[in-house]
Design a protein with these regions (language model features):
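N-terminal secretory/targeting leader peptides
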Residues: 2-25, 31-128, 134-136, 140-339
């Protein structure tokens, strides 16, 4: 039988390594960085994209380097739908998108995403809903049903029609091939006013305008400017038909796995950054509209806004029928409209 003799010096060396191992492991753990991929489809240069850029830097700095956040705007990591799905799965830790995306999984919170149209009166109404009890409740529901926490709400403002031909009343929208998000509630809305809604991915709008697949789209002024859609369509009709809040979506499993101080940092810094984003968005909307005018876009006001509201009013009952909770949410939102 072979004998295995270990010298005294070798034994001391081995012992030293064993003793040092916990310290080495601890040092490695302390140096390990927590990846946070922030990906979305908002336009480069928009107030919302700038807010995510600011938040990325803040997370990196305030975490002392423990969080390694990286920002991927304008669809760099996939389409809107892909970003939402990857966020739910945890492959993308943070994204943004309207609560209307939850039309199927949680219709009661889709109402806070502007569904079913003309539900928000103005910015003050939006704040009463999302910065109060309803906003917090919506986040809890999203967490339970989708695995994503809404840590705050950014915004891009009210949406309007950008088209290749003039639209100033409900008769002129008849048959208009307009791009809409790939959600039933949006299709239903535009059918009610007589348009021809065409569901398409967000990133395909420029090419769809250029090829004639669509005649129009609907969006906020910042996106119209940022994605240069005005190069293909020169008529902007101020309809304010939809206000789409941009929920700041954080994967709940990722968030829960963070140390307590970093969880607090993520939530608190989001509130700080996106409060300023909302202020900036509202302060710059009029300026951005003037820039669109200067680029050659003609701006119109609806001459018959009450007819649009009347044509889509039945959507409230139809959407409310999805569940008692959905009806209750719509009633609460409308009840906060003010005088």
């Amino acid at each position: 039988m072979k004998s295995h003799n270990i010298s005294r010096r070798r034994l001391i060396q081995i012992g030293g390594v064993v003793i040092a191992m916990p310290a080495l492991i601890g040092t490695a753990a302390a140096q390990a960085k927590i990846a946070a991929r922030i990906a979305h489809n908002e336009a480069i240069g928009s107030p919302l994209t700038q807010a995510f850029e600011n938040w990325t830097k803040l997370l990196n700095e305030k975490s002392g380097g423990r969080i390694e956040a990286a920002h991927f705007p304008a669809g760099q990591l996939g389409s809107y739908t892909q970003n939402i799905e990857q966020n739910r799965l945890g492959a993308i830790q943070i994204t943004t998108g309207g609560p209307d995306t939850e039309e199927t999984l949680a219709p009661e919170i889709a109402a806070t995403g502007g569904a079913p149209g003309f539900i928000f009166r103005d910015d003050a109404h939006v704040d009463r809903v999302l910065q109060g009890e309803i906003g917090a409740e919506v986040s809890r529901i999203a967490r339970a049903k989708t695995g994503v926490e809404f840590v705050d709400y950014g915004e891009v403002g009210f949406r309007h029609i950008l088209s290749k031909r003039k639209v100033t009343n409900i008769d002129e929208v008849k048959g208009l091939k307009i791009r809409v998000p790939e959600l039933k509630v949006w299709v239903d809305f535009w059918k009610k006013v007589g348009a021809n809604p065409t569901p398409l991915p967000y990133a395909e709008q420029y090419s769809a305008l250029s090829t004639g697949l669509i005649d129009a789209l609907e969006a906020d002024v910042f996106s119209i400017k940022g994605f240069k859609w005005g190069e293909q369509a020169k008529h902007l009709t101020y309809t304010s038909h939809w206000f789409l809040p941009k929920a700041v979506r954080v994967n709940a499993r990722w968030l829960d796995a963070l140390p307590a101080d970093l969880q607090k940092l993520v939530r608190d810094s989001a509130k700080q950054v996106f409060a300023e984003q909302r202020r900036q968005n509202r302060a710059n909307a009029a300026k951005t509209l003037e820039e669109l005018k200067a680029s050659g876009i003609t701006v119109y006001q609806l001459s018959d806004a009450p007819k649009w509201r009347a044509a889509t009013e039945s959507l409230y009952a139809e959407f409310s029928a999805k569940s008692p909770a959905t009806k209750a949410m719509i009633d609460r939102i409308r009840g906060l409209a003010g005088s």
